[in-house]
Structures are given as structure tokens and as C-alpha cells.
Amino acid sequence: MALWRSSDNLVYLPPTPVSKVISTDDYVTRTNIYYYAGSSRLLTVGHPHYSIPKSSGNKVDVPKVSAFQYRVFRVRLPDPNKFGLPDARIYNPEAERLVWACTGVEVGRGQPLGVGLSGHPLYNKLNDTENSNIAHAENGQDSRDNIAVDYKQTQLCILGCTPPMGEHWGKGTVCARTSSAAGDCPPLELMTTHIEDGDMVDTGYGAMDFAALQVNKSDVPLDICQSTCKYPDYLGMAADPYGDSMFFFLRREQLFARHFFNRAGVVGDKIPDSLYLKGNNGRETPGSAIYSPTPSGSMVTSEAQIFNKPYWLQQAQGHNNGICWANQVFLTVVDTTRSTNMSLCATTESQPLTTYDATKIKEYLRHGEEYDLQFIFQLCKVTLTPEIMAYLHTMNSALLEDWNFGLTLPPSTSLEDTYRFVTSSAITCQKDLAPTEKQDPYAKLNFWDVDLKDRFTLDLSQFPLGRKFLLQIGARRRSVVPSRKRRTTTTAPTPAKRKRSKK
């Protein structure tokens, strides 16, 4: 008897349609009005390796300022809808809203080129494995040494309207079914977080959480042994559907290994016996195979600088072509080619020293940085059609709130309770009440705030970046003061008429 049964093959249904992300060029109209804005000189000074607290209390007296930190500038722009425009007829406030588009940027860096050293007075160094004349040294209780290094060389610039994202390796979670003991290697997890001002860059030792993954505080130099070194998540920011975190980026990295050491300590993962043959004369047991180089960024030169030159944004790599949503720009800068650490000293005596005595002199370290940010912004307008408003609300609902637009919910048909005194202790806690003030989504993050709300100007020719921009677009400046020199007039002699000859 034949028995019919359905096919065992899986039936694949078509995927659900995904809303298409459109480029800002499709709904943002650009005008021919450009503004210049600059921050002037920005300075910061501190200790290059660690922050110094005050003698009384936990407040910081001298901050940590290192060339190997990220500088994340949060540049605040004026609201163009409340801006004094040269022509009020440029847009219709009832059906359009104005936004800024960043078309040019220049990051100015002061101070000379230099190489700054970092290190650790108790660095975990067992043997010099590059020029070793023995198989291994005795792995004593403490063999740490005073080692200094020059870090990896990095120049970086990221521009976007949201904070950049960084990645690093952190300590993961051990599964409950996995047995673990003290001293086992911790599991690793790739973590993605925002890059904040003051976060450490990758110095050549890897992007990782050293405080959680290196308990000896001696495997890396002082300035990162209790910090987290982050590396920009270029893959994640490039895959951002809206392209807000990274319009474009500039990057230059350089590194080589200067010295080769191995680590002191008990080797957690033993070398398999099949990988070596035992010997004599102290070579019965191999030494530590936990090798680690010291990085070096090598020579710094002005010919390889990405700063102090203009960059023009014609087409961003994502869907956001330079539109500064929420009237702000995030500029992330790293420059380790100006990492000079200044050595300062002062005498402990009230009178000037007549002879050198090191016990009467205090030595200090300081690092200073100098920046100058310049921008060219283009005035743009968005036509608020129902389709565009729905798209913007899906992308970022706060934009419509900033433009005094909101969604009106349909009236509820059910009976709801509304208390009068919502803060009274006599009634139940009103947890679902909406906050009265708008919350800053980045309030808990640390950035270098730069306010440019009163620094916009139409006189592009009066500023260095503005003149470079006018040269790019082919504009010619006309002289305001007329020339007093009288033009010389020349008269050409009138040619003599030829007489007709009679035939």
C-alpha cells in the first residue's frame, strides 16, 4: 500500500523586506552659502604617565595628558533655524528646516616634532632573547627591570556627527558548565565601546583591557598598565547604516620591534614534548617561551604629516554626506609624532645652588599639546514631507523634537488614572513619568567640548582655511580699495591711406 508523505526538504521563505537607507543627498538641498568657524588655540598640559591627586582628597591636581591618548572634540554648532541669515527668503520655515553640512576641515597642530618615552621601573623582563648566550636564566621570585620604550607611531583623524566606536579585548565570562581554577587563562571577549577623550590608543602592545587581563602590573609601561587601549572599530563604523559616526578618516601607523624579551613567571601552557629534544648543561628544561617585543615608532618626519593641511569632503563613505545632525560634530585626533615629554626640575633650597647635588633637586615630567580646529560649513535645507519626516523619526526621533515636531498619539479609549501630586510619598511611585528636561545621550561620556556657536562668519577671505576654500571653488577676491595709479594710455599711429592709382 503506497503511503503519501510530504517532502522532508526545508521550505525557505523569502526574507522580510528591510527598510532601505537613503543617502542624505536624496532629501537634503544644499545652498550656495558657506560659513567659516574656528576654535583658535586649544591647549592642555599634564603628566604624561599618570594623574596626580591633590594632597587632601581624591580630586585630581595634575591630569594625565599623553600624546598616546585620544582627543575627541565635541564641536557644538549654532542652530541654523535660529541663526541670523543674510537672506530670510532662503527657506520656508513652515515646510523646511535648515541643517549644517561640513565641507572642509583642518586640524592644526603646534609644538615641534619629538619622540616621548614611556616605560616601567619594574618591567617584567626575564631574558634578552635576541642576543642570548644561555638557554635560559633562573626564573627567580622577582627579576623585573627598569625598561623604557618609544611607542608605536600613530596619526589619526576621524570626523563624524556621533562619537567614534572603538574595540578592545576584555575579560569574558566563563561558562557555568566549564570548571575553572585560580590561575587559569581568562576567556577573551571582543568589546565595542565609544572612544572618549583621554582613552589610550594602541601603543604596540595590543588593544586590550590591561587592568583586567594583566594582574602583575608589570607587563606593559606605567601609562597603560591600569588602562584600556582601544583601537577604532573601522569595520563597525563602515557598516553603520546611516554613516553618522565616520564621514571619513585619515590614518597613518608605523611600528617595528626594537628588543625581544621573554616573561618571568610560571608558563601556563606547557610546551609539548614533541616540539623539542632535551639536552644537557642546563638545557634539560626549556626556559620561558612567553616572548614579547618592545615596540618602536622609529623616526618622525614632517614629510609624513597628515595635520596642518586642509581636507575637503565631497563624498562621504557612508549614507551621511557630512550632514551635522543635532548641530554637532565629533572630531577624533591622535598624533604621537609630537610626544615630547618636558623634563622640569626645581631646587628644594631657598637659595640658588652653587654646586650640583642631586638630593636637593626635584625632577618632574610634563607634556603639552596645542590644537587649532578650523571648519567650513555649508547651509542646507530639508523639505519636511510626510515621507521624509517618517524616515527621520525612524533614524533619530530627537531630530524632530529639536525642530518642534512631535507625534500625536491617538486618544486612548480605556480609563486611565492620573494623580495630582506625583512626587508625594502618599501615593505609589510614578516611575513611568516622562522626564521634564531633554537628556543628553552622551552626558556620561567624556569629550573636549568646543563651542563654536558664536564663531560663524561669512567673511571666508579673512581666515586661512577660508582663503584655501575660495581657491578651491575658483572664487576670485576683488580689491576693496581702488588702485590710485593712473592707467597709461597709448595711441597707435593711424596708418596712412593709400592713394588709388589711375589706370
Swiss-Prot record:
One of its GO terms (cellular component) is host cell nucleus. Keywords: Capsid protein, Disulfide bond, Host nucleus, Host-virus interaction, Late protein, T=7 icosahedral capsid protein, Viral attachment to host cell, Viral penetration into host cytoplasm, Virion, Virus endocytosis by host, Virus entry into host cell. The keyword Disulfide bond applies. The gene is L1. Pfam families: Late_protein_L1. Forms an icosahedral capsid with a T=7 symmetry and a 50 nm diameter. The capsid is composed of 72 pentamers linked to each other by disulfide bonds and associated with L2 proteins. Binds to heparan sulfate proteoglycans on cell surface of basal layer keratinocytes to provide initial virion attachment. This binding mediates a conformational change in the virus capsid that facilitates efficient infection. The virion enters the host cell via endocytosis. During virus trafficking, L1 protein dissociates from the viral DNA and the genomic DNA is released to the host nucleus. It comes from Human papillomavirus 29. It is found in: Virion; Host nucleus. The keyword Disulfide bond applies. Self-assembles into homopentamers. The capsid has an icosahedral symmetry and consists of 72 capsomers, with each capsomer being a pentamer of L1. Interacts with the minor capsid protein L2; this interaction is necessary for viral genome encapsidation. Interacts with protein E2; this interaction enhances E2-dependent replication and transcription activation. Belongs to the papillomaviridae L1 protein family. This is Major capsid protein L1. Signal peptide: none annotated. Residues 480-503 are annotated as: Disordered. GO terms for biological process: endocytosis involved in viral entry into host cell; virion attachment to host cell. GO terms for molecular function: structural molecule activity.
